[in-house]
């Protein structure tokens, strides 16, 4: 959803706008204005949908897997319907160089990832919201008794996630110069969950560090590149990922049982 939005706004000419109607033609706007407006719209849309999933979890005690899966299906349906299932066009070629400039062979998009890591680390470790996040994740009943609003903290967690989704989709749109389809990014949710689990984030809640998540991402990225270099079939790579996830979750469950 975020990437489609960014492409609509930052597209070069009206090739993408033709799918949605000329009302979405932003070609007259300056490149910088288009890029910033696209970022704003990406964040607004992704945050809105994340809030919906968070609301159902916080208000009706719905399992997060169900609320987010339903959200994902709704978004996929909307994007597929809006784009008619066709790939959307390229964005203004000048825009990516503004925010992801080429410096030799160095992938400068990593710098944005570092900024996101620092911001999330600060929120988790240096703010009241971050401390409440761990408290609610570890034991929501005890957190509520101590005066913490479980509803607000849960919704806040989804809002933070939505903002990051929007910013990430905007960056990915820049990296891919707007080229993509409604199915773009499918499967990334499993990669993200796998990286978190391998990095020590507990499914039982209340446990996890940003350094662990970064480690998990590096492990899975290294695994993917290694298997590709070794010539392992792409379909077989999913088997290796599944085994790693199963092992990591099993260890997490064993730790939880031992604590009990």
What are these regions, as identified by a protein language model?
Residues 64, 106-113, 154, 187-189, ...:
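Loop-to-transmembrane alpha-helix initiation sites
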Residues 165, 176, 180-241:
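Transmembrane alpha-helical segments in multi-pass inner-membrane proteins
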Residues 2-6, 42-46, 72-80, 112-123, ...:
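Hydrophobic core segments of alpha-helical transmembrane domains in multi-pass membrane transport
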Residues 9-10, 29, 45-90, 123-128, ...:
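Short loop segments and helix-boundary regions at transmembrane helix junctions
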Residues 34-42, 49-53, 105-180:
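Helix-loop-helix "hairpin" substructures at the membrane interface of multi-pass membrane proteins
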Residues 1-52:
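Membrane-embedded helix boundary and interhelical linker motif in transport proteins
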Residues 19-36, 60, 64-127, 153, ...:
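Transmembrane helix-bundle core of multi-pass membrane transporters
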Residues 145-152, 223-260:
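Cytosolic-side transmembrane-helix boundaries in multi-pass membrane proteins
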